[in-house]
Amino acid sequence: MASNGYSNSADAVPPPPSDNDGRPPSPPPPPPDSFVPPPPPSSLAPPPPPSSDLPPPPPSELLPPPPEPKKKKGWGAPKPGPLSIEDILKKKKEADEAAAKPKFLSKAAREKLALEKRAKEVEEQKRKREAEQDNRISIGSVNGNGNGYGSAANGRDGYERSYQQENGRRESSFVPTGPRAMRNSQQSRSSSDKPNDMEPPPKPAKSAAAGTGKASVAGEKRPANAEDLQAALIKTRYMGAETNQSTFSAKKKRRRTTEKKFNFEWNAEEDTSPDYNPIYQNRAEAGLYGRGRLGGFAEDEGATLKYAKALEERDAEAGGARAREIVEMERRRKEDAGRNSLDKHWSEKKLEHMRERDWRIFKEDFNISTKGGAIPNPMRNWSESKLPKRLLDVIHQVGYDEPSAVQRAAIPIALQARDLIGVAVTGSGKTAAFLLPLLVYISELPPLNEFTKNDGPYAIILAPTRELAQQIEVEAKKFATPLGFTCVSIVGGHSLEEQSYNLRNGAEIIIATPGRLVDCIERRVLVLGQCCYIIMDEADRMIDLGFEESVNKILDALPVSNEKPDTDDAEDAQAMSRHLGGKDRYRQTMMYTATMPPAVEKIAKKYLRRPAIVTIGNIGEAVETVEQRVEFVAGEDKRKKRLNEILASGEFAPPIIVFVNIKRNCDAVARDIKHMGFTSVTLHGSKTQEQREAALASVRSGATNVLVATDLAGRGIDVPDVSLVVNFNMATNIESYTHRIGRTGRAGKSGVAITFLGNEDSDTMYDLKQMLTKSSISRVPEELRKHEAAQQKSQRGQGMKKIEEGGFGGKGGGGGW
């Protein structure tokens, strides 16, 4: 209380130094009940005592006066009077209205409030530390004086001496910040050691220490200039941060503590030099000769035009010519900037402005990878494809607005007369990718007449199944018929007489299965004397079905006079596009497949010359638009019940395809589906060609809801808008499974594939789990993830493959496998 009283009086008016010289130290303060304030300074007259005769002042005089730098205290302070009820209610109403109004704080105000709050926290922490330090000093003084067992006088004298020594050290460690008139009094009062002095107060240096602490905190938090900031940063760098000072920086990028990678890169946000050095805050701009920021060439066109206009006004003849040169230079600069700009997407650039980086991004966007020499860049749209105008018109009439990924990459390569191997997933648009270059190729050959029509077709397309061959025929007629070309399909199931009648007028393009085409060649129904374009679609499937020998016979029957050389000339587009001896051109061979088994590689190495390899996506992976679901359902009855639940849910619209493994089961499942109330047809190898075509036609037209088929329909069959594929029995290998689920999700549309698994499917569980893991929209069920057969790849079947390949060449002893 005494220290507070003296500090208040000292804050109001400092006492004159002449009155304090030579006086003994002030006596200790009296108790609170007998407290008498010190007499007022002589320079100010005390206010008159309040008279009881005068009436109380009106409420307007009781309002607080404007803020003054210092308030009178003690006897000079005005005596507060009672407030009226109206004033209290008025103040309360004004306070409520002020509190209800939203108060906007600027950034500087928010920073000021944060600094004040931080200063108060630091002051409170420092006050606590000083209190603890004083407490330790007092305890140490008592213990050092005989553990407190000495006399009271000795204990008090020892306490006073220890306090004076500690106080002297503390005052000497701080720089005086108070008024000059009060320094001597404090020093004399602290340095006096007379026997008649009483004990000092418990915290005599609190005000000085607190004042010094506030000043230091304010100096640390808000330095006066940039030099103090830089000095503080250097001090922190070499001496370390203070104990209670946060080292968090909002600008510095934070890294996770669990991250093990070492970061070798430097981020611009980690530069803290602009915080303390103002030279880094303002970027220096180049000032060159001439008007404008860059010597007459400003970044905006308006400044350039203004400069050119000023030149023209100054000198109409020479200045006008110079102005036109400046405008032309600015235009060229903008064109160069647009050509070399990295911020534009490849779709916004012109073809001549595309750089190597843009083509890499383009290929990554469409998941295109190419291999081979002298491969041209892909096409971004149909207008850049270099196709003839009449063919482009047909493409737009058919409704092909944007090319697919395989069409973007394969068509420019095929137009250069290069041999090609295309590896793409099912439903990716491969048919148009090889049909369009084929039509361009044969359009440069002379049309067939009465003499040349007997020499055979210009091109043949091989397909593994009848359905796929007929599907390619339908697609080819869309483009070939408007151009005046004839397409004929030769497949099994139809009589040779009927197909011979279709070939009576000749045909430029023949689509055939390998077995039936070999029969036609051996029976002299067809010759390949002028065939110079060969396409093998689903080549891996043809090998799986045992057509390898038939394919070799067909390729050996081709003429050798126009075969490409196995040299670097095979990669030269101009050399391969030349005509040989008038009408003949070099033979061009293309192969499309979903996988690349060794037998397919062997055929490609024998008959293709320096082929370019185009891969869309990853080999053997499913289409990304198909959601794969796997359910463990054991037993035929439970699977039929689950199939009924799926069909009756109404989640999937027809058509729906259900795959089984054996023909007998195919008819049984179709019969059960009819009992469920849905129309169904079957498709398997025992059906005649007419029955197959009728079944596919009913599904495509919408007359039938469900198609139940074996793996015969798993390759190349295009039924539009299939929403669901159900694998009633899991396929025997992962390749067949991939082609099964590829019947849905075609042409960029989404689809769902549901597979019923059992313990009998352990050979394919590992590959199935890997395929589900790679899919971004599919989920691996826990039962499959933890299954023993899914932990490692099955070794079953490799021994059987060795038996087939050894000794009998796949016949005789190995045929039973």
Curated annotation (Swiss-Prot):
Q: Name one GO molecular function term.
A: nucleic acid binding
Please list the residue ranges that the record marks as compositionally biased, kind Pro residues.
Answer: 13-67
Q: Which InterPro entries match?
A: DEAD/DEAH_box_helicase_dom (IPR011545), Helicase_ATP-bd (IPR014001), Helicase_C-like (IPR001650), P-loop_NTPase (IPR027417), RNA-helicase_DEAD-box_CS (IPR000629), RNA_helicase_DEAD_Q_motif (IPR014014)
The record's region (Disordered) falls at: 1-86, 118-225, 778-817
Question: What is the residue range of the motif Q motif?
Answer: 380-408
| Localization terms from the record | Cytoplasm; Nucleus
Q: Which GO terms describe its cellular component?
A: cytoplasm; nucleus
The residue ranges flagged as biased composition, category Polar residues, are 1-10
The listed location of motif DEAD box is 537-540
User: PROSITE patterns this protein is in?
Assistant: DEAD_ATP_HELICASE, HELICASE_ATP_BIND_1, HELICASE_CTER, Q_MOTIF
Gene Ontology annotations of biological process type:
mRNA processing; RNA splicing
The record's section on SMART domains has: DEXDc, HELICc
Report the principal subcellular site. Answer: cytoplasm
Enzyme nomenclature, EC number: 3.6.4.13
Q: Where is the composition biased (Basic and acidic residues)?
A: 118-135, 780-790
Source domain of life:
Eukaryota
Signal peptide span? none
Pinpoint the Helicase C-terminal domain residues.
Answer: 625-788
Which portions of the chain have biased composition (kind: Gly residues)? Answer: 806-817
Q: Name one Pfam family in it.
A: Helicase_C
Q: What is known of its domains?
A: The Q motif is unique to and characteristic of the DEAD box family of RNA helicases and controls ATP binding and hydrolysis.
Q: How does it assemble?
A: Component of the U5 snRNP complex.
Similarity field: Belongs to the DEAD box helicase family. DDX23/PRP28 subfamily.
Q: What is this protein's name?
A: Pre-mRNA-splicing ATP-dependent RNA helicase prp28
Q: Which organism is it from?
A: Botryotinia fuckeliana (strain B05.10)
